[in-house]
From Swiss-Prot:
This is Ribosomal RNA small subunit methyltransferase H. It holds the Pfam family Methyltransf_5. It catalyses: cytidine(1402) in 16S rRNA + S-adenosyl-L-methionine = N(4)-methylcytidine(1402) in 16S rRNA + S-adenosyl-L-homocysteine + H(+). Keywords: Cytoplasm, Methyltransferase, rRNA processing, S-adenosyl-L-methionine, Transferase. Specifically methylates the N4 position of cytidine in position 1402 (C1402) of 16S rRNA. InterPro entries: RsmH, SAM-dep_MeTrfase_MraW_recog, SAM-dependent_MTases_sf. GO terms for cellular component: cytoplasm. One of its GO terms (biological process) is rRNA base methylation. S-adenosyl-L-methionine binds at G40, G41, H42, D60, F84, D106, Q113. The keyword Glycoprotein does not apply. It comes from the Bacteria. Its EC number is 2.1.1.199.
Amino acid sequence: MTHLNAFSSVEHSTVLLHETVDGLALKENGIYIDGTFGRGGHSRLILSKLSANGKLIAIDRDPKAVAEAQKIQDPRFQIEHNTFSEILSICEKRGLVGKIDGILLDLGVSSPQLDDAARGFSFMKDGPLDMRMDDSKGISAAEWLQQVSEQDLAWVLKTFGEERFAKKIAKAIVNYNKSAVQNGSEFLTRTLQLAELIAHTVPFKDKHKHPATRSFQAIRIFINAELDELEKVLQSALTVLAPAGRLSVISFHSLEDRMVKHFMRKQSQGREIPKGLPLREDQIQRNQTLKVIGKAIMPTDAEIAQNPRARSAVLRVAERLN
C-alpha cells in the first residue's frame, strides 16, 4: 500500500526524512508513534510503508499541526493533541504499553512554526512575542519577560541558550520593561523589538549568526519546557517500546543532543558494577535496556544546501532490549 503522493509535497523540507524512518526498521504490521507530527512528513512516509494491519499514532501539542493531521483519512492513523511527554498515558489508554515497535521524535521548533510570524518564534519576522507551541496553554514569552527577574532571566539565557552575554542581555530586557512601566510606554511585545534590543546590547561579530539566536532559543525552550518534556519521553519510551522496538530521535541543538546521547549511552551500558567484586562476567546483571544502533547521522551537504535549517541536525537511533 503506497501513499507516495501524500508526502511528496513535504519531503523536501523534512530533515533526514528517510534516514529517520529507516532507523525505525519498520515492520509492515507494526505499531508506531510519531511524537512530533509537525506537517506530517515522517508520518506520511511511515504510512506508505505499513500494511493494512499496521498502525501509526501521531502526537503534537500544536493545534495547527493537529488540524493538518486530521486531514489524513486513513483507518491506520490516529492523532493526539498532546505533548509527547504523555506518551505513556497515551499508550495506557489504548492497551499498548510494551507493544510499540518504534518511536520517532523530531525535536525543536518546526519550519511552519518558524515561518509563521504570528507564532513569535522568529527574530527575522515581526510578530507577537509568543513562542508557545500550544498557544491555548501557559503564558506567552512577552508576558513572562514582563515578570521575570534579571537573575532568573540570565539563568535561562545561559542554561538553555548557552549565551555568553546572558547577564548583559537580561539586564537590557528587564530595564526596558521597567522603563516602560515608569514612562507608560509599551513593553517588549514584538519579536523584532526584542531582536533589535539584543542586537544593540551585544557585539555583532558572527556575520552568519544573528546575535538574538541563542536568546530566542533559550526563551522558547523555557516557555515550552522542552528539555523537561524530552527527559520524560525518553524515560517513558523504555516502558512503551516492545522488545527490539526502535527509538529514532533528531535533535537540532547541543543541549538536546547531549541529553539524547547521554540517555542512550547510559541505558546501553546498564548499571555500573563496583570494581573488585568477586563475580564472573556471566554473574553480572547490568540491566542494559537499550542498544545504540550505529553512529550519529548528520545531513549531507546536498541536503543542507537544499534546506539550510538542516545544518545542525543530528539523528541518533537505539533499540529496546528484552
